[in-house]
A protein has these predicted regions:
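Extended catalytic cores of very large enzyme megasubunits
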Residues: 1-169
Length: 169
């Protein structure tokens, strides 16, 4: 029934004379696995929200305004059932000078913990929890610490295990 409902909802605004043809063709394609439907569409298309985005990329810059805006965007997209990609490679590394050395940067780990918490705070309509992959360039100042963030050794202070990571070469 799910595939028929998805097909009907997708084409509900099409002209009546063509709608049933499109519904049947789409149903045939998805029910025989000729095409695959992403989870957000499968889980949410039949709800009033109708989220079509499967994944989004949130690009965070180095300023606090950008980091906190990125965190807000992450929360909103997770609540809309989207998988999250986070480009966090421009966030300065631990000990970097801020305002001419007046302050030293806390590094990426505290901000990753914030992103992790935001991703985990919303379930996607009870179907699954939120998920995110964080992207870093291989030349990032903290790359050695980033590479072991999911490692089972270490303490919760220096691990962020519930995010996934990719390294950009």
């Amino acid at each position: 029934y799910m595939y028929m409902l998805i097909s009907a909802v997708l084409f509900k605004n099409y002209p009546k004379e063509k709608r049933l043809t499109y519904v049947k063709r789409y149903y045939e394609a998805v029910s025989t696995f000729k095409i695959n439907i992403p989870t957000p569409i499968m889980a949410g298309l039949r709800t009033p929200l109708r989220q079509f985005a499967s994944c989004v990329l949130v690009d965070s810059d180095d300023s606090l305004d950008s980091i906190f805006s990125s965190d807000m965007a992450i929360g909103r997209y997770v609540a809309q059932r989207a998988g999250i990609g986070i480009n966090a490679g421009r966030i300065r590394g631990l000990g970097s000078k801020i305002r001419g050395g007046e302050v030293q940067h806390t590094g990426v780990i505290p901000f990753l913990k914030k992103f992790e918490s935001t991703v985990r705070c919303c379930t996607q309509n009870g179907v699954r929890g939120g998920s995110a992959t964080v992207h870093f360039p291989i030349w990032h100042q903290e790359i050695e610490d980033i590479l072991v963030l999911k490692n089972n050794k270490g303490t919760e202070d220096n691990r962020v295990r519930k995010l996934d990571y990719s390294i950009q070469i």
